[in-house]
């Protein structure tokens, strides 16, 4: 089977970030704060034709044609406080995040909005036994979001032997990471 596939894609990504750090030398501490914004917009227009041996022409394959839009907005604020007390160092922080993922087939009347509000704490502790020996313990919460292709609800026929279809209702993955180290 011969197939022609025309895929037009447009991607826009806008990122803005501001960070502030303030040292408090009188108590051997540091404060950091900041904000970040990420805006993504993607449009995918796919047109497919299959070769018809009888008519010896390419014929439009309506099953494989689609127009897909993906919008993502992530807004976050963070704050961190760290201090050293003799041989002991600690740091604690929090990131607050509001995010939207909007994966939609433009031809579809169903509008899907994945809307999330999350807190991401972190804590790091270190104790120095000597200049060459240190024990550390840390915790952080992270997020992994599905990408636009994983959320695309249209079945891709670009390869007749391997069909792909995303799930627009996929939820993000949250990871609680603990680390114990000795150097």
Task: Give the residues covered by each predicted segment.
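Outer-membrane beta-barrel signature, preferentially recognizing the C-terminal barrel domain
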Residues: 66-70, 143-183
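Acidic/polar loop patches that form or flank catalytic/metal-binding clefts of enzymes
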Residues: 128, 132-138
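Surface-exposed extracellular loop regions of Gram-negative outer-membrane beta-barrel proteins
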Residues: 72-111, 116-122
């Amino acid at each position: 089977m011969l197939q022609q596939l025309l895929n037009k894609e447009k991607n826009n990504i806008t990122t803005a970030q501001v960070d502030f750090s303030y040292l408090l030398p009188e108590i051997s501490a540091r404060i950091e704060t900041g904000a970040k914004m990420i805006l993504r917009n993607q449009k995918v227009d796919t047109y497919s034709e299959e070769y018809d041996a009888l008519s010896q022409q390419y014929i439009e394959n309506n099953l494989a044609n689609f127009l897909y839009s993906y919008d993502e907005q992530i807004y976050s604020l963070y704050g961190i406080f760290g201090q050293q007390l003799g041989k002991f160092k600690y740091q604690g922080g929090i990131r607050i995040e509001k995010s939207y993922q909007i994966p939609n087939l433009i031809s579809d009347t169903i509008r899907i909005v994945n809307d999330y509000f999350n807190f991401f704490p972190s804590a790091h502790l270190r104790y120095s036994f000597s200049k060459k020996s240190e024990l550390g313990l840390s915790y952080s919460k992270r997020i992994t979001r599905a990408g636009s292709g994983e959320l695309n609800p249209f079945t891709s026929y670009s390869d007749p032997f391997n069909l792909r279809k995303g799930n627009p209702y996929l939820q993000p993955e949250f990871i609680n990471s603990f680390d114990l180290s000795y150097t």
